[in-house]
Protein backbone atom coordinates (compact mmCIF):
# COMPACT_ATOMS: atom_id res chain seq x y z
CA UNK A 1 0.00 0.00 0.00
CA UNK A 2 1.32 3.47 -0.84
CA UNK A 3 2.08 6.11 1.72
CA UNK A 4 -0.21 9.13 1.49
CA UNK A 5 2.64 11.37 0.35
CA UNK A 6 3.49 8.86 -2.41
CA UNK A 7 0.02 8.91 -4.00
CA UNK A 8 -0.12 9.83 -7.67
CA UNK A 9 -2.91 11.89 -9.26
CA UNK A 10 -6.12 9.88 -9.21
CA UNK A 11 -5.02 7.74 -6.27
CA UNK A 12 -6.84 9.73 -3.57
CA UNK A 13 -9.93 7.73 -4.56
CA UNK A 14 -8.02 4.55 -3.73
CA UNK A 15 -7.18 6.00 -0.31
CA UNK A 16 -10.83 6.82 0.32
CA UNK A 17 -11.80 3.27 -0.65
CA UNK A 18 -9.22 1.89 1.78
CA UNK A 19 -10.55 4.19 4.51
CA UNK A 20 -14.12 3.05 3.82
CA UNK A 21 -13.06 -0.61 3.89
CA UNK A 22 -11.34 -0.20 7.25
CA UNK A 23 -14.35 1.72 8.56
CA UNK A 24 -16.46 -1.31 7.59
CA UNK A 25 -13.93 -3.67 9.20
CA UNK A 26 -14.14 -1.67 12.42
CA UNK A 27 -17.93 -1.96 12.26
CA UNK A 28 -17.61 -5.74 11.85
CA UNK A 29 -15.26 -5.80 14.84
CA UNK A 30 -18.00 -4.21 16.93
CA UNK A 31 -20.05 -7.39 16.60
CA UNK A 32 -17.33 -9.56 18.14
CA UNK A 33 -17.94 -8.80 21.83
CA UNK A 34 -16.35 -9.83 25.11
CA UNK A 35 -18.95 -8.63 27.68
CA UNK A 36 -17.22 -6.73 30.50
CA UNK A 37 -19.02 -4.02 32.49
CA UNK A 38 -19.39 -1.08 32.10
CA UNK A 39 -17.93 -1.03 28.56
CA UNK A 40 -17.72 -4.17 26.38
CA UNK A 41 -14.42 -5.17 24.78
CA UNK A 42 -14.53 -5.72 21.02
CA UNK A 43 -12.18 -6.11 18.05
CA UNK A 44 -12.81 -2.51 17.05
CA UNK A 45 -9.50 -1.36 18.53
CA UNK A 46 -7.64 -4.04 16.57
CA UNK A 47 -9.10 -2.80 13.28
CA UNK A 48 -8.49 0.82 14.30
CA UNK A 49 -4.80 0.06 14.90
CA UNK A 50 -4.51 -1.98 11.71
CA UNK A 51 -6.06 0.83 9.66
CA UNK A 52 -3.71 3.40 11.16
CA UNK A 53 -0.64 1.22 10.72
CA UNK A 54 -1.38 0.47 7.07
CA UNK A 55 -3.01 3.73 5.95
CA UNK A 56 -1.16 6.37 7.96
CA UNK A 57 -2.50 9.18 10.12
CA UNK A 58 -4.84 10.94 7.70
CA UNK A 59 -6.54 7.94 6.11
CA UNK A 60 -6.42 5.91 9.33
CA UNK A 61 -8.27 8.65 11.20
CA UNK A 62 -10.61 9.07 8.23
CA UNK A 63 -11.49 5.36 8.36
CA UNK A 64 -12.51 5.71 11.99
CA UNK A 65 -14.38 8.92 11.25
CA UNK A 66 -16.34 7.01 8.60
CA UNK A 67 -17.15 4.34 11.19
CA UNK A 68 -18.34 6.89 13.77
CA UNK A 69 -20.37 8.84 11.20
CA UNK A 70 -22.10 5.67 10.00
CA UNK A 71 -23.16 4.96 13.57
CA UNK A 72 -24.31 8.53 14.20
CA UNK A 73 -26.41 8.36 11.02
CA UNK A 74 -28.29 5.39 12.46
CA UNK A 75 -26.58 2.29 11.08
CA UNK A 76 -26.18 -0.30 13.86
CA UNK A 77 -22.39 -0.41 13.68
CA UNK A 78 -21.52 0.28 17.31
CA UNK A 79 -20.96 -2.43 19.90
CA UNK A 80 -24.07 -4.49 20.51
CA UNK A 81 -25.78 -3.20 17.35
CA UNK A 82 -26.31 0.26 18.80
CA UNK A 83 -26.56 3.40 16.68
CA UNK A 84 -27.33 7.08 16.85
CA UNK A 85 -25.93 10.25 18.36
CA UNK A 86 -26.96 9.04 21.83
CA UNK A 87 -24.21 6.41 21.74
CA UNK A 88 -21.61 9.12 21.10
CA UNK A 89 -23.00 11.08 24.05
CA UNK A 90 -23.18 7.98 26.29
CA UNK A 91 -20.65 5.96 28.32
CA UNK A 92 -18.82 4.66 25.24
CA UNK A 93 -18.67 8.01 23.42
CA UNK A 94 -15.19 8.87 24.64
CA UNK A 95 -13.89 5.60 23.25
CA UNK A 96 -15.45 6.33 19.85
CA UNK A 97 -13.81 9.76 19.75
CA UNK A 98 -10.63 8.03 20.88
CA UNK A 99 -10.71 5.73 17.84
CA UNK A 100 -10.27 8.72 15.53
CA UNK A 101 -7.57 10.32 17.69
CA UNK A 102 -5.82 7.00 18.36
CA UNK A 103 -5.74 6.11 14.66
CA UNK A 104 -4.19 9.47 13.87
CA UNK A 105 -1.54 9.04 16.58
CA UNK A 106 -0.66 5.46 15.58
CA UNK A 107 -0.40 6.42 11.92
CA UNK A 108 1.76 9.43 12.73
CA UNK A 109 4.14 7.45 14.95
CA UNK A 110 4.44 4.61 12.44
CA UNK A 111 5.11 7.01 9.54
CA UNK A 112 7.60 9.23 11.41
CA UNK A 113 11.20 8.44 10.55
CA UNK A 114 12.36 5.66 8.27
CA UNK A 115 10.88 2.28 7.56
CA UNK A 116 8.97 1.11 10.67
CA UNK A 117 10.09 -2.05 12.40
CA UNK A 118 8.05 -4.27 14.71
CA UNK A 119 9.20 -2.45 17.86
CA UNK A 120 8.17 0.98 16.56
CA UNK A 121 4.83 -0.39 15.37
CA UNK A 122 4.20 -2.03 18.76
CA UNK A 123 5.09 1.20 20.59
CA UNK A 124 2.90 3.25 18.24
CA UNK A 125 -0.07 0.91 18.75
CA UNK A 126 0.46 0.98 22.51
CA UNK A 127 0.50 4.79 22.48
CA UNK A 128 -2.66 4.84 20.36
CA UNK A 129 -4.43 2.39 22.67
CA UNK A 130 -3.44 4.51 25.68
CA UNK A 131 -4.94 7.57 23.99
CA UNK A 132 -8.17 5.68 23.18
CA UNK A 133 -8.49 4.49 26.76
CA UNK A 134 -7.59 7.91 28.22
CA UNK A 135 -10.34 9.56 26.17
CA UNK A 136 -12.72 6.67 26.85
CA UNK A 137 -12.20 6.72 30.61
CA UNK A 138 -12.48 10.52 30.62
CA UNK A 139 -15.80 10.33 28.78
CA UNK A 140 -17.04 7.58 31.07
CA UNK A 141 -16.12 9.66 34.14
CA UNK A 142 -18.01 12.67 32.76
CA UNK A 143 -21.13 10.81 31.63
CA UNK A 144 -21.48 8.25 34.44
CA UNK A 145 -20.06 10.55 37.14
CA UNK A 146 -17.47 7.99 38.15
CA UNK A 147 -14.03 8.55 39.58
CA UNK A 148 -11.15 7.56 37.29
CA UNK A 149 -10.49 4.54 39.52
CA UNK A 150 -14.12 3.41 39.23
CA UNK A 151 -14.14 4.00 35.46
CA UNK A 152 -11.08 1.83 34.88
Predicted regions and their residues:
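Hydrophobic transmembrane alpha-helices
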Residues: 2-61
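Alpha-helical transmembrane segments of multipass membrane proteins
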Residues: 27-31, 49-50, 54, 69, ...
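C-terminal TM-helix exit segments that contain a strictly Trp-centered aromatic cap at the helix terminus
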Residues: 46, 70, 131-141
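Short helix-perturbing small/polar motifs within transmembrane alpha-helices
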Residues: 2-6, 21-23, 28, 85-132, ...
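Juxtamembrane helix-entry segments on the extracytoplasmic side of multipass membrane proteins
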Residues: 43, 88-89, 147-152
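Interfacial helix-loop-helix junctions of multi-pass membrane proteins
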Residues: 75-81, 139-152
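Interfacial aromatic-anchored transmembrane helix boundaries in multi-pass membrane proteins
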Residues: 30-41, 66-102
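Alpha-helical transmembrane segments and their helix-entry boundary regions
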Residues: 60-64, 121, 151
